[in-house]
């Protein structure tokens, strides 16, 4: 079991953040088999055991079932011997010193990526309003549009423009304390503060910043303790006239299981909508990206690429990287013929829009199982293999996010979907039979 457990840990580490892995997954200890495919897993205390079971138990069971070749059920329990006072490895923020001093700025980590600036952001009709609002906030934090709530689909540039605000604020005033953090990281730090009895430090850390940038705020919905703490953090910063910027995948009033008091606060400033880029903006994005990579892209090639990939900026840039790699590896110039060859699967995929329901039905028929089996909790390979294939195809052929796909497959966690997609992606290159299965299914779905 120890060998399998070690391999499982490596697999999980690829699917979760470093903070989550170090704080919650690595400390787990594998016990022995207690019969009927059930294995004991120990955490330091009941709280940790319950937390890991609820959020990552399914992912661990999925990975171990695949490695052992049979369904696995994990039984989580506490082992006080594992409890030790270790320091949290998640990002922390140094509190502002009393008396108006800013503290040691060298020890403060903003979490910002310096590549995300307003200069590197391509402005078009789809995002002009968001860009203008973000620039205004960066020039005068908390003077207008507080909070600024940016929402839109996956890969449209919300994170880019949010971090551009932070980088611009620091460019104007390097002594400002700016913090960019994902909502998942906020939740992890909160849980660690409760676990290690450092709640006061947690509160002081987050309430000492001048600008707080929170990405994917929708993920705190349904999490009572996290919503409670974020509510008080929001109020403290707002009353102190500090700037708050948030991103989400939908309007505040459309986020399910979000407390009304938070919903009203998220919408009391400016709510800005990030739309998918139009053709001209997609072309401009491609040309800017190509220029930064030292590539020369003919206009006809740029327009063809922009027309072939209409989903989001992330996939558009991914297509350009793929074309560039294909040209580099084959030693050929970037021509229309090369682009069509390197993106033939994407170009063919434009012919028909595919839904999650169609994918589930097609995969179920192909593997001679039921759609309900794909959404069930069974980890038998008879069902787990088709389920992973279906999840992979959903990510490849639809615009749904990992959490959305997980919800369609029996309410599974997004990490389970992420693992399924990565496993299929890895195996198809070395398993011709799997590659043939995927090609057949894609052909059926795109007819």
From Swiss-Prot:
Keywords: ATP-binding, Cytoplasm, DNA replication, DNA-binding, Lipid-binding, Nucleotide-binding
UniProt key word Protease: no
Gene Ontology, cellular component aspect: cytoplasm; plasma membrane
Major site of localization recorded for this protein: cytoplasm
Residue numbers spanned by region Domain I, interacts with DnaA modulators: 1-70
Keyword Cytoplasm annotated: yes
SMART domains found in the cross-reference section: AAA (SM00382), Bac_DnaA_C (SM00760)
Source organism superkingdom: Bacteria
Compositionally biased region (Polar residues): 88-99
Residues annotated as binding ATP: 155, 157-159
Annotated segments matching region Domain III, AAA+ region: 111-327
Region (Domain IV, binds dsDNA): 328-447
Record's signal peptide: none
Compartment annotation: Cytoplasm
Region feature (Disordered): 87-109
Region Domain II: start-end pairs: 70-110
Gene Ontology molecular functions: ATP binding; ATP hydrolysis activity; DNA replication origin binding; lipid binding
InterPro entries: AAA+_ATPase (IPR003593), Chromosome_initiator_DnaA (IPR001957), Chromosome_initiator_DnaA-like (IPR020591), Chromosome_initiator_DnaA_CS (IPR018312), DnaA_C (IPR013159), DnaA_dom (IPR013317), DnaA_N_dom (IPR024633), DnaA_N_sf (IPR038454)
One BP term from GO: regulation of DNA replication
Similarity field: Belongs to the DnaA family.
Summary of subunit composition and partner proteins: Oligomerizes as a right-handed, spiral filament on DNA at oriC.
PANTHER family in alphabetical order: CHROMOSOMAL REPLICATION INITIATOR PROTEIN DNAA
Protein purpose: Plays an essential role in the initiation and regulation of chromosomal replication. ATP-DnaA binds to the origin of replication (oriC) to initiate formation of the DNA replication initiation complex once per cell cycle. Binds the DnaA box (a 9 base pair repeat at the origin) and separates the double-stranded (ds)DNA. Forms a right-handed helical filament on oriC DNA; dsDNA binds to the exterior of the filament while single-stranded (ss)DNA is stabiized in the filament's interior.
Domain comment as written in the entry: Domain I is involved in oligomerization and binding regulators, domain II is flexibile and of varying length in different bacteria, domain III forms the AAA+ region, while domain IV binds dsDNA.
Protein name as annotated: Chromosomal replication initiator protein DnaA
Organism for this UniProt entry: Magnetococcus marinus (strain ATCC BAA-1437 / JCM 17883 / MC-1)
Gene this chain is encoded by: dnaA
């Amino acid at each position: 079991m120890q060998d399998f457990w070690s391999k499982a840990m490596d697999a999980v580490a690829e699917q979760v953040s470093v903070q989550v892995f170090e704080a919650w997954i690595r400390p787990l200890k594998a016990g022995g088999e207690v019969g009927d495919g059930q294995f004991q897993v120990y955490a330091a205390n009941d709280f940790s055991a319950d937390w890991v079971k609820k959020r990552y138990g399914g992912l661990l069971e999925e990975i171990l079932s695949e490695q052992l070749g049979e369904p696995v059920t994990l039984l989580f329990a506490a082992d006080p011997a594992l409890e030790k006072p270790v320091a949290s490895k998640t990002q922390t923020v140094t509190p502002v010193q009393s008396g108006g001093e800013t503290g040691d700025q060298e020890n403060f980590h903003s979490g910002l990526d310096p590549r995300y600036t307003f200069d590197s952001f391509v402005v078009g009709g789809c995002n002009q309003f968001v860009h203008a609002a973000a620039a205004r906030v960066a020039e005068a934090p908390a003077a207008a549009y507080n909070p600024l709530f940016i929402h839109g689909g996956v890969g449209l540039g919300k994170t880019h423009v949010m971090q551009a605000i932070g980088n611009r604020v620091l460019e104007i005033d390097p002594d400002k304390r700016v913090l960019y953090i994902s909502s998942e990281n906020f939740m992890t730090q909160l849980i660690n503060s409760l676990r290690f009895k450092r709640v006061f430090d947690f509160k002081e850390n987050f309430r000492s910043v001048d600008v707080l940038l929170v990405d994917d705020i929708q993920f705190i919905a349904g999490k009572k303790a996290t919503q409670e703490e974020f509510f008080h953090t929001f109020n403290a910063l707002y009353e102190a006239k500090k700037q708050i910027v948030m991103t989400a995948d939908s309007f505040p009033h459309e986020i399910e299981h979000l407390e009304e008091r938070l919903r009203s606060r998220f919408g009391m400033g400016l709510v800005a909508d990030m739309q998918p880029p139009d053709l001209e903006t997609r072309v401009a994005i491609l040309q800017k990206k190509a220029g930064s990579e030292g590539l020369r892209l003919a206009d006809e090639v740029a327009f063809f690429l922009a027309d072939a990939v209409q989903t989001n900026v992330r996939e558009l840039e991914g297509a350009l990287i793929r074309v560039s790699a294909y040209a580099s590896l084959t030693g050929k110039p970037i021509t229309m013929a090369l682009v069509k060859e390197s993106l033939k699967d994407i170009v063919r995929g434009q012919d028909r829009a595919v839904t999650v329901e169609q994918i589930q039905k097609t995969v179920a028929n192909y593997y001679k199982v039921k759609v309900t089996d794909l959404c069930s909790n069974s980890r038998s390979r008879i069902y787990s293999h088709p389920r992973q294939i279906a999840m992979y195809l959903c990510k490849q052929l639809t615009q749904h996010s990992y959490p959305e796909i997980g919800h369609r497959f029996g309410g599974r966690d997004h990490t389970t979907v992420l693992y399924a997609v990565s496993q299929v992606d890895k195996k198809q290159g070395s398993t011709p039979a799997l590659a043939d299965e995927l090609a057949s299914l894609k052909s059926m779905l795109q007819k």
